[in-house]
Amino acid sequence: MSRIILSAASRVGNVRSNNEDMVLAFDRFVRSDVYATEFMTGNSDRFVIALADGMGGHNAGEVASSDVLTNLRFFLGDLPPRLSTGEFYEMMEEWLQSVNHMISSKGHVNPEMAEMGTTLVGVIFYNDKYYWMNCGDSRLYRYRDNKLAQLTTDHSLINKNGVKKHSNIITNCIGGGCKNSYMDMFEFTNDVLSGDQYILCSDGLNDMISDEEIARLAAQGASANQMCEAAIEAGGYDNVSVCVIIVK
């Protein structure tokens, strides 16, 4: 049993007029707000902490990120207990295809929501196991022993072609015209250590400040909102959302 210390923040930034990011912070949806809580893993057989960075015109990105996180929360709550890791992966794959169809269908019905989509990155605790998941270019970092490591791989042209000027063009998401969305998933239960910090973020953080700066903030015990503030002070050209998960 571990104690989880969680902080979450989602900010509009300096340039955008609306916030298309959203965070699901254990028991709270967070958008243009901050939140903090603590809980014991033994008090629940499952929980999810996730972040979605929406995209699309006419505020459709707000709808996509909200719909996906709301759907994920209900899906995880309805999962039967004690699925094996393989069965859990299969259920998550079925969920991804279902929610991708749902988001895409909304775009077909309402032209203002055409091509809307969202990234998704998150940590799930289920059946005494930890999993991380990723679809898009939002990130999961781990800070341990004064070192920051990116656990997820960006699904973007910067990784496909090595062309840095296209780093903001993603190659995978939920909705957004992606007919064959996929999700990286990894079970990392045996690699979770007391003292670890796990940082979920939208690209509004890592586009504004370097990994070295993120590591410096983590070393100081910065909250999610303090990390958002650093990105906003550096320019804040995009929405910025962060979750900091500390394992005790």
Language-model segment annotations:
Residues M1-K248:
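PP2C/PPM-type serine/threonine phosphatase catalytic domain
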